[in-house]
């Protein structure tokens, strides 16, 4: 998975839904296994960097939990990923507790040697456009300091509010009209 940073061409973002992955597994098992190895390895890197005891992202949990995975590849090699899904959460707005189905960013990782090149922002913006959602309408699952800094840098001004369930939301989350998890 080590691609020299100076070779920054042939970048591609691929979206993998549960249905896409099940179809790939049944139609091209070799490609499925390669993707599975790459995603599982990157999921381990992401969890290790966040000092988590378990792995957040594997191809199995994408299909089991009906999440969506966005993969950033260069010349067929995985260099970044972003996992989103819908969760039923209790969110506190400062006065009341609200239970709702929420669009959530569950994992986001770019290989170390590809950071600080705008690739994370490109991947993040691709997901926002694909899901027709704004960053302030997402709930962020226990975001690392790096992710919080990323959000503040690229989507400023933003005040992030920690929730009792370890999710974080933008201060304006409750100020926007409520709709389905992904703008539906």
Curated annotation (Swiss-Prot):
PROSITE patterns, per the entry: GNAT_ATAT
Origin: domain of life: Eukaryota
GO MF assignments: tubulin N-acetyltransferase activity
Gene Ontology cellular-component terms listed: microtubule
Binding positions for acetyl-CoA per the UniProt entry: 108-121, 144-153
Catalytic activity from the UniProt record: L-lysyl-[alpha-tubulin] + acetyl-CoA = N(6)-acetyl-L-lysyl-[alpha-tubulin] + CoA + H(+)
Protein family according to the UniProt entry: Belongs to the acetyltransferase ATAT1 family.
UniProt-recorded name of the protein: Alpha-tubulin N-acetyltransferase
């Amino acid at each position: 998975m080590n691609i020299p940073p100076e070779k920054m061409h042939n970048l591609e973002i691929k979206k993998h839904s549960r249905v896409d992955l099940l179809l790939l597994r049944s139609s091209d098992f070799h490609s499925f296994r390669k993707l599975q190895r790459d995603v599982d390895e990157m999921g381990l890197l992401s969890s290790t960097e966040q000092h988590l005891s378990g792995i957040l992202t594997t191809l199995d949990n994408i299909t089991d939990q009906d999440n969506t995975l966005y993969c950033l590849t260069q010349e067929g090699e995985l260099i970044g990923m972003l996992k989103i899904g819908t969760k039923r959460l209790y969110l506190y707005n400062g006065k009341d507790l609200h239970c709702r189905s929420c669009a959530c960013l569950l994992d986001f990782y770019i290989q170390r040697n590809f950071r600080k090149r705008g690739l994370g922002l490109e991947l993040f913006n691709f997901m926002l456009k694909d899901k027709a959602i704004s960053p302030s309408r997402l709930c962020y699952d226990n975001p690392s300091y790096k992710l919080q800094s990323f959000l503040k840098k690229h989507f400023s001004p933003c005040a992030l509010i920690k929730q009792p369930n370890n999710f974080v939301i933008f201060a304006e989350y409750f100020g926007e009209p409520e709709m389905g998890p992904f703008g539906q």
